């Protein structure tokens, strides 16, 4: 049958490329498994594993079969929600690892018994949502002032990171590395070679972000600003960095040559600001800043590289942005 079909399609020719030799089926299966494992980020897989382990431990503790029936899932949520607010989210990890073993998982997860237990757990816990405050221009200037006062390379790096995070609307995870080195991915690191200088602007290539899962890359462009000017700061930093680290590939490096980590960032960040602010504050701050200028939501969404659904959730749950937009609209009317 296969040869008949090939003949009807014009023979075995597939392209002008060199013919591809067959692979051993075991090697193909191993390759397929490798690709499946890499379908999600390692950090996501680690979080999923946490949820799956929690569910398995629950079943062992209560002498229940692993089969995720509606009753078992309901019991799991009822038990876990006493201790953690993320119990319903853990079911995503359970699904990831057990779906192949139990194909009916989605139907059971959507069962009215499970849905009502999840809804009840959220209402009973009623955990408040704590949003980090947006960073303001005065905060950025504070970090620049520290760098100018100390003359420290690492303090300059910190000021540069925050300026880039703010004006580039970055997630901090795009500029700094996780503390867990096993989760670091060289492909995501911004490279020194991608930096391009022009008269009044500078740009680099962001190789990956959440809305770009296939590493197509995005050019992040900075223009001159009155406060914590990213163009001037990056020029100064890159000149100093090149003298220290020469041809090392990563753009953002500490004085000792290591990548800036989350713990390093937190130490510097919270030396000046309190816990009402966080790593997401620069991104929130720039969105708020743009809104205060009357920039439309669609432009803010594009600048921040948000997916549509994520942006709708983001702007709805950050009233500061709505306030700034309303004030900007009033100013434009007058």
Regions found by a protein language model. Give the residues of each.
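Extended, non-catalytic subsegments within catalytic or DNA/protein-binding/adaptor domains
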Residues: 1-334
């Amino acid at each position: 049958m296969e040869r008949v079909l090939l003949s009807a399609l014009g023979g075995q020719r597939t392209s002008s490329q060199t013919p591809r030799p067959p692979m051993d089926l075991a090697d193909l299966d191993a390759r397929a498994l490798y690709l499946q494992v890499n379908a999600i980020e390692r950090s996501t897989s680690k979080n999923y594993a946490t949820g799956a382990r929690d569910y398995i431990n629950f079943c062992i503790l209560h002498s229940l079969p692993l089969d995720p029936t509606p009753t078992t899932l309901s019991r799991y949520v009822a038990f876990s929600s006493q201790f953690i607010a993320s119990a319903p989210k853990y079911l995503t990890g359970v699904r990831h690892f057990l779906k192949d073993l139990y194909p009916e998982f989605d139907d059971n997860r959507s069962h009215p018994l499970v849905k009502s237990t999840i809804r009840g757990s959220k209402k009973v816990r009623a955990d408040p949502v704590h949003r980090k405050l947006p960073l303001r221009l005065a905060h950025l200037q504070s970090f620049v002032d520290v760098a100018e006062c100390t003359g420290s390379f690492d303090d300059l790096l910190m000021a540069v990171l925050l300026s880039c995070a703010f004006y580039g609307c970055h997630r901090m995870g795009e500029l700094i590395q996780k503390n867990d080195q096993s989760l670091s991915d060289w492909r995501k690191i911004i490279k020194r070679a991608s930096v391009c200088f022009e008269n009044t602007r500078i740009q680099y290539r962001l190789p990956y972000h959440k809305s770009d899962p296939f590493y197509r890359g995005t050019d992040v462009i900075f223009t001159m600003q009155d406060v914590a000017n990213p163009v001037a700061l990056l020029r100064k930093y890159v000149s100093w960095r090149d003298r220290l680290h020469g041809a090392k590939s990563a753009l953002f490096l500490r004085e000792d040559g290591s990548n800036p980590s989350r713990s390093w960032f937190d130490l510097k960040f919270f030396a000046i600001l309190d816990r009402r602010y966080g790593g997401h504050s620069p991104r929130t701050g720039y969105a708020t800043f743009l809104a205060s200028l009357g920039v439309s939501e669609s432009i803010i969404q594009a600048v921040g590289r948000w997916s549509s659904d994520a942006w709708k959730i983001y702007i709805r749950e950050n009233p500061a942005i709505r306030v700034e937009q309303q004030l900007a609209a009033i100013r434009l009317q007058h």
